[in-house]
């Protein structure tokens, strides 16, 4: 019997796959537990439509990420910070991913989620710093920061 998997089933198939499985297994286990449904021509058509919509949505997200990368790669896109600095040359406050995200939004109107900004630890030094940003699984950019003494 041909079934369309509605969820990942270990050893049998992944969500969205169409596979041939034994009839008893399909009727008594997969279909009863809503892990799969019978692959009729109508359900196959629905699946193809959903997959096309998903691909289109992913393409839009990728295009948006590439547009943000283009803005971040420009030389004039340099996020400015003014921080108080102690005698040892380190800032009193630290610059976190949240602060970077907020300043990027305020100064350039570019929205980047703070969770996408890759910071090992908050920045406490002054000068020019480049911070990597993972905009999409295929798109990575750099945010240029200029941290000056206030």
Swiss-Prot record:
Could you tell me which InterPro entries the record lists for this protein? Ribosomal_bL9 (IPR000244), Ribosomal_bL9/RNase_H1_N (IPR009027), Ribosomal_bL9_bac/chp (IPR020594), Ribosomal_bL9_C (IPR020069), Ribosomal_bL9_C_sf (IPR036791), Ribosomal_bL9_N (IPR020070), Ribosomal_bL9_N_sf (IPR036935)
Q: GO molecular-function annotation terms?
A: rRNA binding; structural constituent of ribosome
Q: What's a GO cellular component annotated to this UniProt protein?
A: ribosome
Highest taxon of source: Bacteria
- Give the record's keywords alphabetically: Ribonucleoprotein, Ribosomal protein, RNA-binding, rRNA-binding
User: What biological process terms from GO does the record include?
Assistant: translation
Q: Which HAMAP family does the record cross-reference, listed alphabetically? A: Ribosomal_bL9
Function comment: Binds to the 23S rRNA.
Which PANTHER family does the record match to this protein?
A: 50S RIBOSOMAL PROTEIN L9
Q: Which family does it belong to?
A: Belongs to the bacterial ribosomal protein bL9 family.
- What is the protein named? Large ribosomal subunit protein bL9
């Amino acid at each position: 019997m041909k079934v369309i998997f509605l969820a990942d089933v270990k050893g049998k198939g992944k969500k969205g796959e169409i596979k041939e499985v034994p009839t008893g297994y399909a009727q008594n286990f997969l279909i009863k537990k809503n892990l799969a449904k019978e692959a009729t021509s109508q359900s196959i058509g629905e699946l193809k439509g959903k997959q096309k919509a998903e691909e289109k949505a992913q393409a839009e997200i990728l295009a948006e990420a590439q547009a943000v990368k283009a803005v971040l790669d420009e030389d004039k896109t340099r996020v400015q910070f003014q921080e108080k600095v102690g005698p040892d040359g380190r800032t009193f406050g630290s610059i976190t991913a949240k602060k970077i995200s907020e300043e990027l939004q305020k100064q350039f109107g570019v929205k980047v989620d703070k969770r996408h900004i890759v910071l090992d630890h908050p920045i406490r030094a002054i000068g020019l710093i480049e911070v990597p940003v993972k905009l999409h699984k295929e798109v990575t950019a750099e945010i240029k920061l200029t941290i000056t003494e206030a």
